Amino acid sequence: METKQLGTTEQDLALAGELLRQGQLVAFPTETVYGLGADALNETAVAQIYAAKGRPSDNPLIVHVAEKADIAPLVREIPEKAKKLFDRFFPGPLTVILPKSDKIGKVVSGGLDTVAVRMPENPVAHRLLQLAGVPVAAPSANTSGLPSPTRAKYVQEDMNGKIAAIVDGGDCAYGVESTVITLATPTPTLLRPGAVTKEMLEAEIGPIAVAPAVLEKMADGETAASPGMKYKHYAPKAQVILVNGDSAAYAAFVNSQPGCYALCYEEDRVTVPKVPYGKATDDLSQARELFDALRRLDELGAKKVYARMPRKTGVGMAVYNRLIRAAAFRILDLTRPFLIGVTGPTGAGKGYVCRLLAQAGLHPVDCDRVYGQLTVPGAPLLQDLSLIHISE
């Protein structure tokens, strides 16, 4: 298949809209990431999204609309809290989940009885939706599991030859996918963090819950209520390990790891190859640059990456949510002491190894020396252990 490379002229957007109406796939920019769109009311077209991305069929899609009035036919009802969110955040980087109407098929909803709706604020996306004249189901326009594309060139790398057209609208403003909140539960629940933060949502509709899978691995057998919850996402080809620690501890650790790359803040001083993802005090810049940084790590041929852990509040929660999945939930916590026992015959280099481990911020223990102390009657270490375990 030849993939048309389109710009943002009225003629190009009209062609893209016509392709969508014909049941074909079109990638287009939004303020969050590039989306891979199909007519949401055409299940044959929607099924092509899953095939092009290699996406599991139980991973629901978000339906994009041009106007607020386009939402009503897609849902069974619009509760008062939804109206408040629409008034405050639509158009914008927020997705709201509501009970679906019969117009939305199970292919779009991932087999659920709900639908996720969003009205993007990106002017190119908005005009395309107007010209298409249909609601558009669109996940991120990347191969499933890889970092979401924030530039058209990354869409081309993943989707060229698989879809009808790519609309190049430049870089995405926010850089991470939309916030997702469900109102189909007794308590409104945040399912995916984004640029619209938990605090901003609560200012409009009161307290909301945060789904455990936002910050942790989803339980086996649990049904994904939102895109991005269940499967490994956002990951480069390299192995990523998330590192929790302050700037000094992080730098000391990564500088002792030969052959690794550092995915960190601009201010972090490291001697290993470094790919920054924003400033330490600016979580909006972290969100905007994260996926581009993950893609660059692949371009550089990185094999192992130690990523600096962001904070978990505000937009930082969105950055953490993406990074923890890119790392397949691997975390190295430098705030907890790591005790590493070292043993071996005299002359084996235990002292040298202990010094290297200490430089990495770890806590080596010469096990042979400890054992030697424990065999001496009345040794201070033996007395200390006796006091600790006196009841035994």
What do these predicted regions represent?
Residues 345:
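P-loop (Walker A) phosphate-binding loop of NTP-binding proteins
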Residues 342:
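Hydrophobic anchor at the beta1->P-loop junction of P-loop NTPases
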Residues 348:
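ATP-binding Walker
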Residues 386-392:
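Residue-level detector of conserved catalytic or cofactor/ligand-binding positions
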Residues 364-375:
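Short beta-strand-centered segment that lines the nucleotide-binding/catalytic pocket of NTP-utilizing
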Residues 351:
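Walker A/P-loop
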Residues 1-335:
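Active-site-adjacent structural elements in enzyme catalytic cores
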